[in-house]
Amino acid sequence: MIDLHQLSIPRRRKTVKRTLVIFASLALVFMLAAPLFAQSYDPMKFKSSKPQSAWKIALVPKDATNAWFVRMEVGVKQFAKETGINAFQKGPAKTDAAMQAQVIEDLIAQGVDAICVVPVDPSALEPVLGEALSKGIVVIDHEGASQQNCLYDIEAFSNQGLGETIMQELAKMMGQKGTYTTMVGNVTNASHNEWADAGVAYQKAHYPNMTLLAAEPRVEIMDNLDTAYQRAKELFKKYPNLKGILGTSSLSVPGTGRAIEELGLKGKAFVTAVGLPNECAPFIKNGTVDGVLHWDPRDAGYAQLATAVAVLKGQKIANGLNLKAPGWTSMKFAAGSTKVLQGQGWITINKANVDTFGF
């Protein structure tokens, strides 16, 4: 008589075998992928054995066409000229995290020695930056304090301090009362959201007669000038009591300023943000905007490259680091961090000085 139970044993063995193969395959995948996820790297181990003349350092902005990053490239070219190092800027044609990741993939394939990056979305870049680090490529971030796969992130200032200062400027314009909202380039942009969060927290602690717009507390403009204009126009029409916009993108002021003028809301609605002098000048000069906050992207680009060079030289990074750019000459680690370095780089732009910058 045939024992049906015995006939099922080979089948069970095959099932167990398949299960073991699957688990082994998954384990291999995770082992191979390990460099792509956050690891702890010792910056001192990234000292280059090559002569400085052979180094290649790339800076990857969010968007190669954005005026902010066009200005940043001026600093990259200045650094290359002054040091003789092959430093260059290469970025996506628009603000897109996937496109930015592809640019970085291409640079890894080219065998660059260091990648400096201003991330569109830090979390989206973790895999590709992890790959770069695992191959011995120095990674330096700017405006990416939450980035895990980088050796250092350099900031022109404390993100909290800037956010609070933007709010102080907006509150002054609004007479410390009324409804406002926040505007960010991208909701995935770490720095933009930190500035906005700090501004809101400061308002709640210091300006009780100001109120954050509950229906739309954070507006995304995709770092696009036309989108900033359209969204601002929609907001002011939809919410007649809306009195102010706290912006974080450099396009917040020119976009919102245009909307304020077209809707006849000058003196009734207000905006301030970080911004470029030339882009904001018309609105500052005609009184639509009192002032904006700014740091020079040229100096930010220069400072990123200087940080990468310090690591490639095997220099120990410590408080007081001088990156040889205005506002970046005495860097200090953020409280509780061994990765985020902060300078003293912001400037308030107003009618008195808007024409003195030349960009």
Question: What label would you give each PLM region?
Answer:
Residues 3-13, 37-359:
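A residue-level marker of the well-folded mature domains of exported/periplasmic proteins
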Residues 23-35:
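Bacterial N-terminal signal peptides
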Residues 12-22:
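Positively charged n-region of N-terminal signal peptides that target proteins for export
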